[in-house]
């Protein structure tokens, strides 16, 4: 009987440790930085530096991806415009339908952090 109880306690301890590690992995994966999210979701079109020259930006597209480093263009946008574009895609702000919506992919916090990164890239505040 004692051996059976010790075996159950050992199994319970292993499950508890594995659960802790699984929770830590999930938390760190969900807490991607704005830079990581930009590289993963945005750089394909906007480029790693944000200049609109990513590998998916081709001359065949009806519009070019926005150059996020252009203060002249980016300062025309409010923070709300940027958040809406990221959340609902390009059509939400009467821009390219090629810009997909990320509102169901990224959290509000991640979208807000991306907006902050875009403001850093353009070195501007917006209107």
Task: List the predicted regions and their residue ranges.
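N-terminal secretory signal peptides that target proteins for export/translocation
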Residues: 1-8
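Bacterial N-terminal signal peptides
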Residues: 13-23
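Electrostatic cytochrome c docking/interface patches
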Residues: 22-37
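Periplasmic/extracellular electron-transfer cofactor-ligation site
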Residues: 35-62, 88-97, 121-127
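Short microdomains enriched in Cys/His and/or Lys/Arg
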Residues: 64-74
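Axial heme c-ligation environment in periplasmic c-type cytochrome domains
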Residues: 64-66, 81, 85-112
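Residue-level signal for the nucleotide or nucleotide-sugar donor/cofactor binding architecture
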Residues: 77
